[in-house]
């Protein structure tokens, strides 16, 4: 069986046989733990006994809605679904273990990198100033300063014009009584 796991199935019939063998293996483990898939699917007490053995997340403890579709499937398909769920749980456990080990490895190497990063920071430090500037930069700075002065004059004129227009508008409304405005 180890050879067939390492090599991909060459034909669809081999793939079906491999899937069936995996399902039988999972079902055999389920049978050793308290019954086969038919009794586990039909007997809620044996399923509860299996659940009590394994710690579960809050999402798994939540009541699950009945799925009429799965209940309408033949027993052989239900067994395959159950086998796939068990295999997925195994994969999830392996993935969780991988994530924990990966985080530990990252932390280990971050600790190793800290002195090197500190030396890099010490060597690079702040940017050093230059004694020379480009000719194009001086011209751009002068143009920018001229534009700023012109913009400020225009803004002051616009603000004065708006204030005068606002005062005229307020005076027109002040002469009318409140009843006439409606």
From Swiss-Prot:
Entry keyword Nucleus: yes
Summary of the tissues where the protein is detected: Predominantly expressed in brain.
Keywords: Coiled coil, Nucleus
Cystine crosslinks: none
Subcellular location as annotated: Nucleus
Source species, domain of life: Eukaryota
Bias (Low complexity) ranges: 7-21, 28-49
One record GO biological process: nucleosome assembly
UniProt entry tagged with the keyword Coiled coil: yes
Biased amino acid composition, Acidic residues: 135-160
GO CC, any one term: nucleus
Coiled coil: 81-107
UniProt feature, compositional bias: Basic and acidic residues: 167-182
Chain spans, region Disordered: 1-71, 134-182
InterPro entries: NAP-like_sf (IPR037231), NAP_family (IPR002164)
Gene3D superfamilies for the chain: 1.20.5.1500
Family: Belongs to the nucleosome assembly protein (NAP) family.
Protein name: Nucleosome assembly protein 1-like 5
